[in-house]
Amino acid sequence: MKNVTDNLVINNDDLNIKSMKDLKNPVSYGKDTSADFKVQSPGNFKYENSKYEIKSDIIGDHFKSNMLGAVILALLNGIEIKDSLNAIESFAGVKRRIELIGISKGVLIYDDYGHHPTEMEATITALKQQTESKLYVVFQPHRYTRTMEYFSSFKDSLKLADFAIVTDIYPAGESPIPGISSKNFEEESIKYLKSIRYVPEYLSKKVQNGDIVLTLGAGDITLLGPKILKYLNEY
């Protein structure tokens, strides 16, 4: 792919990026007053004394931050801000990124590919902001090695939900590691269920009108959302 710009677009609010030295021609955005594109609130930014708003039905402040980065990159390559904003407004999103699977009895079912603590936290936080009711998260850890490395961070992310269910680890070709098990997540607000097939019936006894259910993971948990929806419709 041919490079048409020599600039580097950076999120000035990211401490990891700010700690990097010798960045070539950085163009920055963020809440920091030194940013080239100043973010006033999620989706609202100022550039060269003009104010702009990112309008999108896609849920999550982190997505709006990514969208702004794309707007800036497009501008550097000759595409006007207003044209990029119009394109974003008509963008319906992608599968498995806070994807609405359906609604049954007032319960909204979402699915997301998130399987790293940082993206899980962003997704859970985004959905928590959408409801005053309860958020139930069903998480299928992906790989034994990843579960071992990020166990504490996974648990912290899950605690952001009102209640979480963790199923057995999806191995993705890995062999089990002694002592690494989804059972280790279990506590008052986190329930361990061995298989995703037990989840629909279990959740049906807990969820109420207005609640949100989020399935999270990179394994076959993506098949669970429609099954939860079907179970709620039938029982």
Task: Kindly give the residue locations of the regions a language model identified.
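Short glycine-/acidic-enriched loop or helix-start segments at secondary-structure transitions
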Residues: 18-21, 38, 147-148, 175-176, ...
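Switch II (G3) loop of P-loop NTPases
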Residues: 109-115
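Structural beta-sheet core signal
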Residues: 10, 28, 137-139, 166, ...
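Active-site beta-alpha connecting loops in nucleotide-dependent enzymes
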Residues: 94, 118, 124-189
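A short, aliphatic-rich alpha-helical micro-motif
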Residues: 2, 158-159, 207
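A glycine-rich beta-strand to alpha-helix segment
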Residues: 198-231
